Amino acid sequence: MGERVTVEGTVENVIFHNEENGYTVLLLTVEGEEEPVTVVGCIPCAAAGEGMTVTGVWSVHPVHGSQLTAESVERRMPEREEDMIAYLSSGILKGVGPATAQRLVERFGADTLLVIEREPERLRCIKGITAQRAKELSDAFRALTGLRQLMEFLARYDLPVYLAMPLQRTYGDGAIQALRDDPYILSRAQYGVDFSTVDEIAISLGFDGDDPCRLRAALTYELEHNAANGHVFLPREKLLFATSQLLAVTPDELELALDKLIEGFGVVEKTIAGVQGCYLPRLYQAETFVAERLLSLVRTPVEVLPRAEKVIDDIEKEQGVAYAPLQRQAVCLAAQGGILLLTGGPGTGKTTSLRGIVSLYERMGLDVALLAPTGRAAKRLGEVTGREAQTIHRALGMSYNELTGQTAFKKNAQDPLEVHAVIVDEMSMVDIELMRSLLEAMRPGSRLVLVGDPDQLPSVGPGSVLGDMLRSGVVPAVSLTQVFRQAEQSAIIRAAHAVDRGELPPLENSGSGDLFFLRRRAPDRLVQTVVELCRDRLPKNMGIPAEQIQVLSPTRKGPCGTAALNRALQAALNPPERGKRQKQWGDMTFRVGDRVMQTRNNYDVLWEKEDGSGGSGIFNGDVGVIQDIDPGGELITLRFDDRTAVYTADLLSQLDMAYAVTVHKSQGSEYPAVILAAASAAPSLLVRGVLYTAITRARRLLILAGDDTVLAQMAANNKQQRRYSGLRRRLKEGYHEQ
């Protein structure tokens, strides 16, 4: 780390600025220095001509040389006339160029900025400025000043300045006052600031520990936190206890605050199986809507295909298959009803049945939408059916509401999907909110087929939609159980079904050549073995290139977690070389050629395909490869399958290395070769569902490397964290009410 210094000067030029988060590269003219100082950091709304006092640390960029990374910035409006002209003509006010700026400063001198802000009617004396234009300039200048002040307020508390835009959209000029009155608004989902951070800010602003704002915000935060962990609601007593732990108060002290939230519709309280359940309003609405629509699909008659059995016989001949009884039953039910659940493990014929259903619908003259929760799952669905498939989000026309922090979709009841049937694969990954959006976008009379493996890990988001539907016994379902002879030849598939039964699969190397076990109980030996497999043994001995190998781990942390594995794999597979550009970000070095994963949804990133088509949005779990880093290290080009996106350097905070990923992150994907690094981890991760999901990610080759006692523990441990959801009960009760 370089020397910490303070420099004072005037902004000469803004080289780069990211409007979303304030990341800026600028040149600062410092008296007594021959060359301007390059300053980088979060400096919102910077403009040429303004004065700055910057405190920061010197570093040396490989291309641009010495630069000062700003830790704190004090800013001053320009005072000299030449600086005012530079400031006003820098682009901060749309339509004000050098000539207009010159006329303004010549007329009003040192009072120019004050006149623009407070006396816009005086601007009409300037050629080309009408009364309307004067008002627009004044409004824009005040908004800019307010935004900059808001960003500086956020920066003072080490909060990300990109929060300023949504805060200003919600609260306007009163955003700072709103934060002073109730800083706990920052803990809401759309802002995503950790509650403990907000709590520290509130204490510094004089808030007491029993302030009603604090208590209500903590209750809501706890519901949001548990929704992120899969719960649709929380029992009242659990909510009170968990929040009391967060705040270090007693549950009794929270009772009144919770009742006030319920009275104000900030929380919905309903009795579920004798338990007082507390819902976030949006999750209550989602759950009740999903239950109602599913029951409607179950009850509503659809046009039945005459002579369905004969049509199915023809499909068998056309596709060269002979359906097993349960497969035939699935295709028949798809022809006769409005909804079908099709479930089964690997090798049980889900894909064959799915192809039959698609062919059947096409023979019935039905337009079919093939959907999946992730891009990789959609790509695989398209490959196995020979038809176009897309993600649910893309089909529904996803957008993002910055005011609410929630995903929104263009397709809905008013503008539904223009298809007669919807087929969704990998249903175990679909949470209650996405299910609500999908059902809302289906027009009346449409059919729905949901395909999945209930033994895989449940959705990351709230609910257990597939499991609840199956356990309700209300939705027509076919569970394929027969493992076909060809599939039985695969040791991978045999291992998956063994684990599903709670058995550890035979760890002697299989005769089929697609599953191997390497016992490595010492963590350093396990990491070394994984590196050797990816770098040498699989590419050289089995012809599997490193880019087709995915390393999985149950955990991110620890000596054999994905963080440690990624460091070792990057060093082995993509080491630094002369001429290969790289960018340091935090404790990570991103290098051209690295495999990376997006770690949170970004709805604004633009991407383009080779055919020139484009769109926006790179989402949590998307995997790409760094193709280029510009000489300045500020622009990074990434390839996500068939999409190319350009990231600014600050967006590197949203990326992680993906040579190794957690099993949870691998859901919905399949890989030619999988290496599972099995080592000790948190008990909640060493469960059967994690091992089963890891095994079923492998298509051609699976290597179980690590501690056999850990594998045995995972296979035997079928404990699943209970998810609080009312969908199953709503389906059962609603069905029997009729």
Q: Language-model features: where?
A:
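C-terminal accessory regions
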Residues: R501, S613, N620-Q738
